[in-house]
């Protein structure tokens, strides 16, 4: 698990129908959230927030993360987004997030992180799958550091949040 308590406004970029954000808000009653995804996706999000009892603390915004993301958050979440894309496309997405984040904010990248060298066969299979299917890839911590640096972020911390998922905390530079 990851501690979202330090943040007052959390934007979940490409957050689907809002399951992650609804759970974050349910566990943190003082927070507000913004769910951001394509119009046809967020159109189905209302019942998720209603069921969690957090509809009054969440805005649902439709848009395109290649163009802009909602501004004013002190945390922007990207869960299992970067592994879908190649580096150049990710830099475009990350620079859009960089323009929107508060100077003291954090970008929270939730992804599987490959072990260096050739460890972890199941993660390597996931990497191959991401390459073949959508054209993306799984990355090592060092590859994430480079990708984020190219997008004007620096990695502040990496927190293991569960099996096969870590939270990469990145700060704007």
Regions found by a protein language model. Give the residues of each.
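Alpha-helical subdomain
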Residues: 3-173
